[in-house]
């Protein structure tokens, strides 16, 4: 009988033999990789996108970000770079976010890829931090297996697109990261410590909603039955202290918004104002539940105001009351459900118009932090329902894939202003502001007729839209329709007498209609409002020149260059008139000052070169005219003038070469033909001499 030999095996390849700790670590790594992937993939379509919507104001034209003003002034400026104490300030104080823009600008300047990469990284970090908080809450409330599914939903939810794909939305991302990190710290330590306070401050200095971290922490303590009176008092004191300091930064003043920003806030009836607010709250909730028709701007007719009880939307308070009653009923059954609801509601409070008026009616970006509570809520509901549905996993995967697809498409729409505004028009065709924005983009791209059509639509939807009146008037003026332009611009300044740009544009239209008295009055009205407008002074100078007041024209242009040394049109016109008045010595005297400000302005070089030639400084003249040609190689005038200069210097071959370039650019140029003929006759005469 054969004996069977059994060999001892020192290890096993069976994954089932792994310890629970190893399994947990492996699953944790898998979950993290899935969340990182899902946070990045939907937003790949926005990489390399332009600066769109309010990016120009918060980044490109922000003097702190672009380095025109010292970085230390970040603490005295609002989010848009204006002085926080100014009456025109938006009163949004977010120095942490602005500092990250400053760093981006230092590294990438106006190349947008780096900005978008940072935003996507921030969204990924926010998702991972949310996952960490969710795992902690699972243990506190004994309600397991919700953190991962909630975090997946958070990673791919389409309502986050504005916060992630729009670079300016970084304020929401940073605020949420610091807020959730503070909550993680609080859940772990229970007591208030320096790290928690620092994270709350960083969150608040990223965006004002961050202050709501403290009430959320209080709710966690209360629902987890671990609150004590002393800790509660410290929390309230911290909330009051940070809130007081934040209001002190604003000088205890609220931002001043217009009816265009938030129409509901300007309703005369407090009753209907409250009804409209409740509808707006429900609409935000609707965007979380059904994120299908997303829009970058919901103002100006997109959501019409409720002004009668016959409007079904007037039932919004009843619906909210019903939801609250249902929530109260479930609070004892599931504390995690209650916390999720409170987390969403509390973090939304700063945008609710309850405590102060905000500068929008509906905004998707403000839902970034509140959506964390919503995602937890969805995970809890899904877990409860999955018990009763066999194919719950298939349905959830299908839903996630649909959300990824929607987010990917939506983030692609944020890539350019044209695609963004076009998508907005399909959702809110009655929004005058979208028509206005689309008109502006089309006009900037040279599509004048399409731009005019959108401006007319904006004015039709809102006849008092003075900015649309101004832009359309300006566009029509450029196309030669000064009469219609004058009519539109006159309406704009009637609607807003302090509209300096419209007064200036009205003056230009009146000047082109030869209404010089009215034009001068309009331009001076503009300067009364904005005395340091170099462009308005330039146009006033043009008016003086047309009415044969050369000295006053030169004075206006000199003032323009004093205010803005880089105003090239003023330098050019000033030099032309000085040359015309035989004052070339002044042109030469001012040339260094001009070229130090506008070194790459071809017309300035040309005029300086012309004056040097008149003073027989041929070498200097040649250098400046050549510089002008280098900057504008296709200018017939520049090549012709260089040919004339060479002819005066008896450098006939070089003169002939310049005239032939002129004729190649403009075959009918009479001056070049005549001068070339003279050169040929001269050469022929010289060749016949003995």
Swiss-Prot record:
<feature type="glycosylation site" description="N-linked (GlcNAc...) asparagine">
    <location>
        <position position="686"/>
    </location>
</feature>
<protein>
    <recommendedName>
        <fullName>Protein O-mannosyl-transferase F38B6.6</fullName>
        <ecNumber>2.4.1.109</ecNumber>
    </recommendedName>
</protein>
<dbReference type="InterPro" id="IPR011990">
    <property type="entry name" value="TPR-like_helical_dom_sf"/>
</dbReference>
<feature type="topological domain" description="Extracellular">
    <location>
        <begin position="256"/>
        <end position="273"/>
    </location>
</feature>
<feature type="topological domain" description="Extracellular">
    <location>
        <begin position="54"/>
        <end position="110"/>
    </location>
</feature>
<keyword id="KW-0812">Transmembrane</keyword>
<feature type="transmembrane region" description="Helical">
    <location>
        <begin position="366"/>
        <end position="386"/>
    </location>
</feature>
<feature type="topological domain" description="Cytoplasmic">
    <location>
        <begin position="132"/>
        <end position="138"/>
    </location>
</feature>
<feature type="compositionally biased region" description="Basic and acidic residues">
    <location>
        <begin position="15"/>
        <end position="24"/>
    </location>
</feature>
<dbReference type="GO" id="GO:0000030">
    <property type="term" value="F:mannosyltransferase activity"/>
</dbReference>
<feature type="glycosylation site" description="N-linked (GlcNAc...) asparagine">
    <location>
        <position position="166"/>
    </location>
</feature>
<keyword id="KW-0802">TPR repeat</keyword>
<feature type="transmembrane region" description="Helical">
    <location>
        <begin position="342"/>
        <end position="362"/>
    </location>
</feature>
<feature type="topological domain" description="Extracellular">
    <location>
        <begin position="387"/>
        <end position="690"/>
    </location>
</feature>
<feature type="topological domain" description="Extracellular">
    <location>
        <begin position="160"/>
        <end position="166"/>
    </location>
</feature>
<dbReference type="Pfam" id="PF08409">
    <property type="entry name" value="TMTC_DUF1736"/>
</dbReference>
<dbReference type="Pfam" id="PF13181">
    <property type="entry name" value="TPR_8"/>
</dbReference>
<dbReference type="InterPro" id="IPR019734">
    <property type="entry name" value="TPR_rpt"/>
</dbReference>
<feature type="transmembrane region" description="Helical">
    <location>
        <begin position="139"/>
        <end position="159"/>
    </location>
</feature>
<feature type="repeat" description="TPR 7">
    <location>
        <begin position="636"/>
        <end position="669"/>
    </location>
</feature>
<feature type="repeat" description="TPR 4">
    <location>
        <begin position="500"/>
        <end position="533"/>
    </location>
</feature>
<feature type="repeat" description="TPR 2">
    <location>
        <begin position="432"/>
        <end position="465"/>
    </location>
</feature>
<dbReference type="GO" id="GO:0004169">
    <property type="term" value="F:dolichyl-phosphate-mannose-protein mannosyltransferase activity"/>
</dbReference>
<keyword id="KW-0325">Glycoprotein</keyword>
<dbReference type="GO" id="GO:0035269">
    <property type="term" value="P:protein O-linked mannosylation"/>
</dbReference>
<feature type="transmembrane region" description="Helical">
    <location>
        <begin position="167"/>
        <end position="187"/>
    </location>
</feature>
<feature type="topological domain" description="Cytoplasmic">
    <location>
        <begin position="188"/>
        <end position="234"/>
    </location>
</feature>
<feature type="transmembrane region" description="Helical">
    <location>
        <begin position="33"/>
        <end position="53"/>
    </location>
</feature>
<keyword id="KW-0472">Membrane</keyword>
<feature type="transmembrane region" description="Helical">
    <location>
        <begin position="274"/>
        <end position="294"/>
    </location>
</feature>
<feature type="topological domain" description="Cytoplasmic">
    <location>
        <begin position="1"/>
        <end position="32"/>
    </location>
</feature>
<feature type="region of interest" description="Disordered">
    <location>
        <begin position="1"/>
        <end position="24"/>
    </location>
</feature>
<comment type="function">
    <text>Transfers mannosyl residues to the hydroxyl group of serine or threonine residues.</text>
</comment>
<feature type="transmembrane region" description="Helical">
    <location>
        <begin position="235"/>
        <end position="255"/>
    </location>
</feature>
<comment type="pathway">
    <text>Protein modification; protein glycosylation.</text>
</comment>
<feature type="glycosylation site" description="N-linked (GlcNAc...) asparagine">
    <location>
        <position position="617"/>
    </location>
</feature>
<feature type="topological domain" description="Extracellular">
    <location>
        <begin position="329"/>
        <end position="341"/>
    </location>
</feature>
<keyword id="KW-0256">Endoplasmic reticulum</keyword>
<feature type="repeat" description="TPR 1">
    <location>
        <begin position="398"/>
        <end position="431"/>
    </location>
</feature>
<feature type="topological domain" description="Cytoplasmic">
    <location>
        <begin position="295"/>
        <end position="307"/>
    </location>
</feature>
<feature type="topological domain" description="Cytoplasmic">
    <location>
        <begin position="363"/>
        <end position="365"/>
    </location>
</feature>
<dbReference type="InterPro" id="IPR013618">
    <property type="entry name" value="TMTC_DUF1736"/>
</dbReference>
């Amino acid at each position: 009988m054969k004996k069977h030999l059994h060999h001892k095996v020192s290890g096993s390849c069976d994954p089932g033999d792994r310890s629970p700790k190893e399994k947990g670590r492996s699953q944790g790594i898998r979950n993290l990789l899935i969340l990182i992937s899902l946070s990045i993939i939907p937003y790949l379509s926005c990489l390399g996108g332009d600066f769109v919507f309010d990016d120009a104001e918060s980044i490109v034209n922000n003097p702190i970000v672009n380095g025109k003003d010292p970085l230390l002034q970040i603490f005295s400026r609002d989010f848009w770079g204006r002085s926080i104490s100014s009456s025109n300030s938006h009163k949004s104080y977010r120095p942490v976010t602005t500092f990250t823009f400053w760093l981006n600008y230092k590294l990438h300047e106006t190349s947008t890829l780096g900005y978008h990469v940072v935003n996507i990284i921030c969204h990924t970090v926010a998702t991972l931090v949310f996952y960490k908080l969710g795992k902690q809450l699972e243990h506190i409330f004994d309600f397991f297996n919700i953190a991962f599914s909630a975090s997946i939903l958070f990673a791919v939810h389409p309502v986050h697109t504005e916060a992630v794909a729009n670079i300016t939305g970084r304020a929401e991302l940073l605020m949420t990261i610091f807020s959730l990190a503070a909550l993680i710290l609080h859940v772990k330590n229970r007591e208030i410590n320096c790290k928690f306070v620092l994270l709350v401050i960083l969150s608040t200095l990223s965006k004002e909603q961050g202050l709501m971290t403290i009430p959320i922490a209080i709710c966690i303590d209360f629902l987890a039955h671990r609150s004590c009176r002393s800790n509660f008092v410290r929390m309230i004191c911290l909330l009051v202290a940070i809130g007081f300091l934040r209001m002190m930064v604003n000088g205890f003043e609220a931002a001043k918004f217009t009816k265009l920003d938030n129409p509901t806030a300007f309703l005369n009836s407090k009753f209907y104002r409250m009804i409209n607010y409740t509808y707006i709250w429900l609409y935000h909730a609707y965007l979380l539940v059904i994120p299908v028709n997303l829009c970058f701007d919901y103002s100006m007719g997109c959501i019409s105001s409720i002004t009668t009880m016959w409007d079904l939307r007037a039932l919004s308070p009843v619906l909210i009351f019903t939801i609250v009653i249902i929530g109260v009923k479930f609070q004892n059954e599931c504390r995690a459900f209650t916390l999720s609801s409170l987390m969403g509601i509390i973090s939304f409070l700063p945008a609710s118009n309850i405590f102060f008026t905000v500068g929008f009616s509906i905004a998707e970006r403000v839902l970034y932090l509140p959506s964390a509570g919503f995602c937890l809520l969805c995970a809890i509901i899904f877990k409860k329902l999955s018990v009763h549905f066999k194919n719950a996993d298939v349905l959830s995967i299908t839903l996630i894939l649909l959300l990824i697809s929607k987010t990917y498409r939506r983030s692609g729409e944020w890539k350019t202003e044209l695609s963004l505004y076009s998508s907005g028009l399909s959702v809110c065709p009655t929004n005058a502001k979208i028509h206005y924005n689309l008109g502006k983009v089309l006009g900037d791209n040279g599509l004048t007729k399409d731009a005019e059509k959108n401006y007319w639509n904006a004015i039709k939807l809102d006849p008092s839209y003075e900015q649309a009146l101004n832009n359309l008037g300006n566009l029509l003026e450029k196309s030669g329709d000064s009469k219609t332009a004058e009519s539109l611009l006159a309406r704009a300044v009637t609607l807003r007498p302090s509209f300096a740009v419209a007064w200036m544009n009205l003056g230009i239209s009146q000047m082109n209609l030869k209404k010089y008295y009215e034009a001068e009055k309009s331009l001076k009205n503009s300067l009364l409002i904005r005395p340091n407008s170099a462009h308005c002074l330039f146009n006033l100078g043009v008016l003086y020149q047309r009415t044969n007041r050369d000295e006053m024209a030169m004075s206006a242009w000199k003032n323009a260059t004093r205010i803005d040394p880089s105003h090239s049109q003023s330098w050019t016109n000033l030099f032309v008139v000085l040359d015309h008045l035989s004052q070339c010595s002044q042109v030469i005297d001012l040339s260094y000052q001009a070229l130090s400000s506008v070194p790459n302005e071809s017309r300035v070089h040309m005029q300086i070169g012309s004056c040097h030639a008149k003073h027989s400084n041929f070498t200097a003249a040649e250098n400046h005219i050549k510089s002008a040609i280098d900057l504008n190689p296709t200018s017939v005038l520049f090549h012709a003038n260089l040919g004339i200069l060479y002819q005066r210097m008896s450098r006939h071959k070089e003169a002939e070469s310049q005239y032939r370039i002129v004729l190649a650019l403009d075959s009918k140029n009479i001056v070049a033909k005549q001068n070339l003929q003279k050169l040929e006759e001269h050469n022929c005469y010289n060749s016949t001499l003995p």
